[in-house]
Amino acid sequence: MSLAASDRDIEGFNALIQELKNRDWDLLLNREEFAFITAVANEHEKWELEVQFHDDSRFTTKSRSRWVVKDESLNRIERAIKRFNFYDDDSNDRTIWKIDKKLQSFEAITEAKVGDDVDFSYFFDAFDENTNYYQSLSDTVRKASTIGIEYNHFSEKNSLIPQRTIKN
């Protein structure tokens, strides 16, 4: 949303916030930006969920790692993530994976439309999709970002390709 948000948008945002508080969600609110951050966890890790509402009846949900992608693996992992997004057959074109270089974090980002559902199912559906996408790749990215890469220096002894010309 922007500064020119309608009364309906403001009421909808406030109603969602109240619903989440009623469900005991711990929220860090930014009412001027129509956004909030909360902590999410599974049995393996904790991460942040950032939700930002926009003025065109859509919102963005980001699951963001609390662990850091190390500098030496940042570019390598970012390239791999871009390939995952390109070749992801299960994608519904609402959610993508990303590396935020500034924060050095792994993210799953979901764009969705704000609905008129009294039970806020539009939000919880996007939340479920986003956290499932995040969890599906998080362990792999975390492990890949902590390993060093070693290169084999091929010699005549360990090369799969013959080092000398073979005569017929």
Identify the meaning behind each predicted range.
Residues 142-168:
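Short, highly charged C-terminal tails/helix-capping segments
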Residues 60-113:
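Short, internal acidic amphipathic alpha-helical interface segments
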Residues 42-71:
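Long, continuous compositionally biased terminal/linker segments
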